[in-house]
Regions:
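Active-site catalytic microenvironments in core metabolic enzymes, especially phosphate/sugar-handling
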Residues: 1-123
């Protein structure tokens, strides 16, 4: 079962995108949108590669944040008028293992982390 987190507020998409980049210390986000000045009220978030859920997210939100958005999925969302932010697969998931390690550090466990950074570099 996939849980879609819904966040409710009112902001212009462009303002939200800039705030998100600052808070998460990310230089670039891939944005699929017909109108960046339109206000959003609900944001849906699923980490990792979750574009297969964009139609469900569209029913419940104005903006969907996920990772690994493929070209044809992005085109379908754009043509339907839905707004998507592609956060990147690694970028949307690395917080999880950092939190998990912090929570379990006192359990005398050894952690093997195979992916310590994003695979793709942007220049």
């Amino acid at each position: 079962m996939i849980i879609i987190n819904i966040y409710i507020f009112t902001k212009r998409k462009l303002n939200f995108i800039e705030e998100l980049k600052l808070k998460l210390k990310i230089l670039n986000l891939r944005v699929i949108s017909n109108d960046l000045n339109k206000k959003i009220k609900k944001v849906a978030l699923i980490n990792g590669s979750a574009m297969s859920y964009w139609r469900k997210a569209k029913k419940e939100s104005d903006l969907f944040i996920t990772g690994d958005v493929g070209y044809h999925d992005a085109l379908d969302a754009l043509e339907s008028g839905f707004n998507v932010i592609d956060f990147g697969h690694y970028e949307s998931e690395h917080f999880f293992y950092e939190i998990l390690i912090e929570e379990l550090k006192d359990k005398n466990l050894e952690f093997l982390i195979f992916n310590r950074g994003p695979v793709f570099k942007f220049y």
